[in-house]
Amino acid sequence: MAKKDYYEILGVSRNASQEEIRQAYKQLIKKWHPDRNHQNRKEAEEKFKEIQEAYEVLSDPEKRAMYDRFGYVGDVPPNAGSGGGFGGFGGFGGFEDIFKDFGDFINNDIFNIFFGDQRTSSRQKQRRAKRGEDINITVDVPFEQVFTGTTIPIEYDRYEVCSHCNGEGVEPGSGWVSCPKCHGTGVVREERRTFLGVIVNQYTCNQCGGTGKIPGETCHVCGGSGRIRKRHRVEVKIPAGVDNGTVIRVQGKGNAGYNGGGYGDLYVNVRITGHIDFERRGNDLIKEIKIDYVEAILGTKVKIKMPDGRVKEVKIPSGVQDGENIYVYGEGVPDMRTGRRGDLILKIKVDIPKRVSRSEKKLLKEIAKLRGKDVDEEE
């Protein structure tokens, strides 16, 4: 399987700042959100998952550092099963091929001697305190609440610290004992004789993860992970002016960490449920208003029911033209950061009747004569 380039997925350079990565992520999830791509939803869902995966790695300094160094995050590189070998060090591919005919043992040992066991380093990290994973959730926010802001209760599943063992993964009272495989050293050393001589293979003990100790008895509640899955509820504040695709970070509300590591964060992706009477462009609101041709000539007043429930009376000046825009300043959506409101824009649509009554037609002909217009006299 080809290795994914997370920088390419987000469209940022390898030295991009966290803010640049965050901005790129926000733009891409807006573009590829499945609910905004009904015609190619399957492709959008795949893209959306790729974007989330890339952001999860590049937004975490520890994961990003590992990805930059090795080309992957986790114990096993993406192409480990395909014979690609040293995934993060393409320049050594030819050197690895020289030894591949000697068997897996010699091949692995040679690389361990010269470059160390990369997989070991990732295992050691897992035994140290590690921050919990972030959680992403999408919530629907009614368009009306964009004006005032709101607080939304959210329930979701997350991993929390096991209360029985206090996150240790060990049954209380049993403690830790010396690892029988590495005898408490955290390192396993093997010597093998080959036609090249004695080759020493040293690697981190995979039974204790390099700590030299194992649980005397594994916690029966969490199975040794130190975490248990629970239903969690949190109140999330949605600020006024929030837009579709906005991501709100709630610190410390993600999954519990490992071995005393802190909680990850909760990322709330906002999806605005539409309003059929208004169109939003930035912080401006646009609404089409139909008026009679007589109202267009003489001027009129219209009452607009705003999304927040208020009724706004707007004066339409005499002589307004079809397609003209009437601006009502400061009646749009509030800016999420400054609080300053956009404008309400009324697009005028003048309704010209196809048929009029006899009396109305007679009056119109009189007006036409006053204006010196030659009109059809036929009934």
UniProtKB/Swiss-Prot annotation:
Zn finger limits (CR-type): 149-231
Any one GO molecular function term: ATP binding
Domain J: 5-71
Annotated TM spans: none
Main location: cytoplasm
GO biological process: chaperone cofactor-dependent protein refolding; DNA replication; protein refolding; response to heat
Needed cofactors: Zn(2+)
Keywords: Chaperone, Cytoplasm, DNA replication, Metal-binding, Repeat, Stress response, Zinc, Zinc-finger
Binding site for Zn(2+) 2: 179, 182, 205, 208
Residues involved in Zn(2+) 1 binding: 162, 165, 219, 222
Protein's UniProt keywords contain Zinc-finger: yes
Cofactor annotation remark: Binds 2 Zn(2+) ions per monomer.
Subcellular localization(s) per the UniProt record: Cytoplasm
Cellular component terms per the entry's GO annotation: cytoplasm
Spans of repeat CXXCXGXG motif: 162-169, 179-186, 205-212, 219-226
UniProt cross-references to InterPro entries, sorted A to Z: DnaJ, DnaJ_C, DnaJ_domain, DnaJ_domain_CS, HSP40/DnaJ_pept-bd, HSP_DnaJ_Cys-rich_dom, HSP_DnaJ_Cys-rich_dom_sf, J_dom_sf
Entry keyword Transcription: no
Organism superkingdom: Bacteria
Family assignment from sequence similarity: Belongs to the DnaJ family.
Cited PANTHER family: DNAJ HOMOLOG 1, MITOCHONDRIAL-RELATED
Record text about domains: The J domain is necessary and sufficient to stimulate DnaK ATPase activity. Zinc center 1 plays an important role in the autonomous, DnaK-independent chaperone activity of DnaJ. Zinc center 2 is essential for interaction with DnaK and for DnaJ activity.
Subunit structure comment from the entry: Homodimer.
Protein name: Chaperone protein DnaJ
Organism: Thermosipho africanus (strain TCF52B)
